[in-house]
Amino acid sequence: VIICWVCFDNYRRRKLLQELEQARAIMESAAQHDFLTGLPNRSKFMKDLEQLIGARIPCTVMMLDIDNFKKINDTYGHTAGDEALQQVANRLKDMQSQILTSYRFAGDEFILILRSSQSMLVEKTAYQCRQVFAKDVTLCGTKRRIGGSIGIASYPKDTDNLEQLIVCADDAMYKVKKNGKNDFAYYGKSTEE
């Protein structure tokens, strides 16, 4: 009887530990992913970028913003805005690879890490991002055209500081918004004008 009880108790403890580990993994995943889009969130982005910069791995950050998103929410409602975010997120997920990860940064902003700063690969990825916005989205059952502005900054070319790299990509994105939207721009002297 004692042997049976010890075996059962060990089994129960292993099962409990397994359930606790599963719960921890679910909580960790939830803490690092955006609920609406399923993409990794800003916290996960910062952790991943910090690891790359800490290891001195050249990389490129692309900040993406849906043009006139407030107008979508104001005209069609927040449910339609959520639909637009989900559709853009799904397209960005389709682009992901071993060297490209998409994140929901904030509001209608997404951010990508390309684990390369090679100019041809960066440009190819920027054009792929433009295609994400070139396709219509379905809002309330109707197809609508959206646009997106994309800012690009590379480590270590533009800066070797994590926070500054994000600022550089953001500055480049706002340059696009200022100059007509629905395009991409690289951070550089032209963004400082």
Enumerate the predicted regions with their spans:
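Selective detector of the "anchor" transmembrane alpha-helix that sits immediately C-terminal
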Residues: V1-C7
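A structural signal for short, well-ordered beta-strand segments
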Residues: V61, F110, G148-I152
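Short catalytic/binding micro-motifs of nucleotide second-messenger systems
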Residues: D94-I99, Q131-K143, K175
